[in-house]
């Protein structure tokens, strides 16, 4: 083990005991607040095109960077899985609409596949009419069920040809191609879609796609690639917003925003100024990286200071963080009609008191250490702990930091245990109860929260984790070619929250929990019978036709023998 890693490990071991001692939960954090959400509050669930649709090469769709990434070799995705079929959502629209109605949601957040609409990524070259028809039919089906579509333009599945020709988001020309794609979507669907999201979690898209290489396109341009990609994504967002504002807003009366994911960063020791600064730095490098240019016109000052200083220490003449011109700052500032927030968990943050020897990177630029409390409930994914109070703090931070914007929670949820096939997900119920209640407290604090999207409708392809992490309200049996869906206990619980528009009283809320667990036992029996049903299906589809063919053959032989005897 290298000396620097020994020092890191010892430092973290010394910090862990401080977590419980330095911070004690306030009565306000521990208490449950019974009450309802404002009238008109919108409840929903979400998904994304690449994770659920399948049909990766059907009806004129072009390849995406994720198609190529998952097809190009072993070790990139757990189990070497692909999303070629995924949930088969392309062919199961009506079935999934029934699930949405069963949940009683007000809205459904989904993404459009850029390469399904524009196979080469460039509008001037080719528009896929079948792609237009597919999404148009989906939108109509939602509206006919009184479900509002909230549409994401880009959720990570960039057309592969744009990556090959131009280097993807490393090239500023992507901003114009994205604007053209956005205009196509506004033109085709804007008469019915009134809530648009330009990008979903662009921070992860930039960091994992252009720094760590864990996501498509798999580039490892450490310390530079992610900042350049983010710079161009922010410009692309602004161009799409201005196009809508100039050309479409007066006709369509819709809203355009962006969805940014961020965990809450809590200082290990609130009496230590260094920890307070580190926690603030964590939030600015996470949320402020994209939100600050959109709401204030430029990157957070702490990002410019830290990356600039480290770039100089590394012998570079210019900062690795790109610079916006004065004209660009003015153009980008104010380009959001609402702030979309995604949030899953919390980290304790402390300053890093030792030098990093790993070279330039996003992680090293921040000069901080992330920790978790060993007492926090550990959920399915290794990174995901249930810490509801962090949600309220993030919502209040965003509210004050960015000038009281309308906020839509666009992602919040918990993953299933690894390869778990149980439908009694009571731990997810506890997660939902805690996090939604903290959101209610944030509204009580004064946060202008308009809606909540739980992640996600279905179990689906989870990027480099394949199908191992299950976030869905509905369990999907991926080993069955029909991809059947089964409701988990959390379906019943979330539905009750939606119908009641919150948590009316202790007795009623407790009854929801008991009812949810009762129904899941029946659903588990259905799921347990699935192997037998699959076997029966195999018998029906393979054995029976084979036997029939043999019967026909034997009959023909007997008939020939009979004819020979008669002759």
Curated annotation (Swiss-Prot):
The chain crosses the membrane at residues 542-562. Residues 23-541 are extracellular. InterPro entries: Glyco_hydro_1 (IPR001360), Glyco_hydro_1_AS (IPR018120), Glyco_hydro_1_N_CS (IPR033132), Glycoside_hydrolase_SF (IPR017853). The lineage of its organism: Eukaryota, Metazoa, Chordata, Craniata, Vertebrata. One of its GO terms (cellular component) is endoplasmic reticulum membrane. It is found in: Endoplasmic reticulum membrane. The gene is LCTL. Glycans are attached at residues 80, 171, 245. GO terms for molecular function: hydrolase activity, hydrolyzing O-glycosyl compounds. This is Lactase-like protein. Residues 1-21 form the signal peptide. It is a single-pass membrane protein. Residues 563-567 are cytoplasmic. It holds the Pfam family Glyco_hydro_1. May form dimers. GO terms for biological process: carbohydrate metabolic process; lens morphogenesis in camera-type eye; visual perception. Keywords: Endoplasmic reticulum, Glycoprotein, Membrane, Sensory transduction, Signal, Transmembrane, Transmembrane helix, Vision. It comes from Homo sapiens. Plays a role in formation of the lens suture in the eye, which is important for normal optical properties of the lens. It comes from the Eukaryota. Belongs to the glycosyl hydrolase 1 family. Klotho subfamily.
């Amino acid at each position: 083990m290298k000396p620097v890693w020994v020092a890191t490990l010892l430092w973290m071991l010394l910090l862990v005991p401080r977590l419980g001692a330095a911070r004690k939960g306030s009565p306000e954090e521990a208490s449950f607040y019974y009450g309802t959400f404002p009238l008109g509050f919108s409840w929903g669930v979400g998904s994304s095109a690449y994770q659920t649709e399948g049909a990766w090469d059907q009806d004129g769709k072009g390849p995406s960077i994720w198609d190529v990434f998952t097809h190009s070799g072993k070790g990139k995705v757990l189990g070497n899985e692909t999303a070629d079929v995924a949930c088969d959502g392309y062919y199961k629209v009506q079935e999934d609409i029934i699930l949405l109605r069963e949940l009683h949601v007000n809205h459904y957040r989904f993404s459009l596949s850029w390469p399904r609409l524009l196979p080469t990524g460039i509008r001037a070259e080719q528009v896929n009419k079948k792609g237009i028809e597919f999404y148009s039919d989906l939108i109509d089906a939602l509206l006919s069920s009184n479900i509002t579509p909230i549409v994401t333009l880009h959720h990570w599945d960039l057309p592969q040809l744009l990556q090959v020709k131009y280097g993807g988001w490393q090239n500023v020309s992507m901003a114009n191609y994205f604007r053209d794609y956005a205009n196509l979507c506004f033109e085709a669907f804007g008469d019915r879609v009134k809530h648009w999201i330009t990008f979903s979690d662009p921070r992860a898209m930039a960091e994992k796609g252009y720094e760590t290489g864990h996501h498509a396109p798999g580039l490892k341009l450490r310390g530079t690639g992610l900042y350049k990609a983010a710079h161009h994504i922010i410009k692309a967002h602004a161009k799409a917003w201005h196009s809508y504002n100039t050309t479409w807003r007066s006709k369509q009366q819709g809203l355009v925003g962006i969805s940014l994911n961020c965990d809450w960063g809590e200082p290990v020791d609130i009496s230590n100024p260094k920890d307070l600064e580190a926690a603030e730095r964590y939030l600015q490098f996470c949320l402020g990286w994209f939100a600050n240019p959109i709401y204030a016109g430029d990157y957070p000052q702490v990002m410019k200071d830290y990356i600039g200083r480290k770039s100089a220490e590394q012998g570079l003449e210019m900062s690795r963080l790109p610079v916006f011109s004065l004209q660009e700052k003015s153009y980008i500032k104010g380009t959001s009609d609402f702030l979309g927030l995604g949030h899953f968990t919390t980290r304790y943050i402390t300053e890093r008191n030792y030098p990093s020897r790993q070279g330039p990177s996003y992680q090293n630029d921040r000069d901080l250490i992330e920790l978790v409390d060993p007492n926090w409930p550990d959920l399915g994914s290794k990174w995901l702990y249930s810490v509801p109070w962090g949600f309220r703090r993030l919502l209040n931070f965003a509210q004050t930091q960015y000038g009281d914007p309308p906020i839509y929670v666009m992602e919040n949820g918990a993953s299933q245990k690894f390869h778990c096939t149980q439908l009694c997900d009571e731990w997810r119920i506890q997660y939902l109860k805690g996090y939604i209640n903290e959101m209610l407290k944030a509204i009580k604090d004064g946060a202008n929260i308009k809606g909540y999207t739980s992640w996600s409708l279905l179990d689906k392809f989870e990027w480099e984790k394949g199908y191992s992490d299950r976030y869905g309200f509905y369990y999907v049996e991926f080993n069955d070619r029909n991809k059947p869906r089964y409701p988990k206990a959390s379906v019943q619980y979330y539905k009750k929250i939606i119908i009641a528009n919150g948590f009316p009283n202790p007795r009623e809320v407790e009854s929801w929990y008991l009812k949810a667990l009762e129904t899941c036992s029946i659903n588990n029996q259905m799921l347990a019978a699935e192997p037998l049903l699959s076997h029966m299906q195999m018998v029906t589809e393979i054995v029976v036709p084979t036997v029939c063919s043999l019967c026909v053959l034997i009959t023909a032989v007997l008939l020939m023998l009979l004819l020979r005897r008669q002759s």
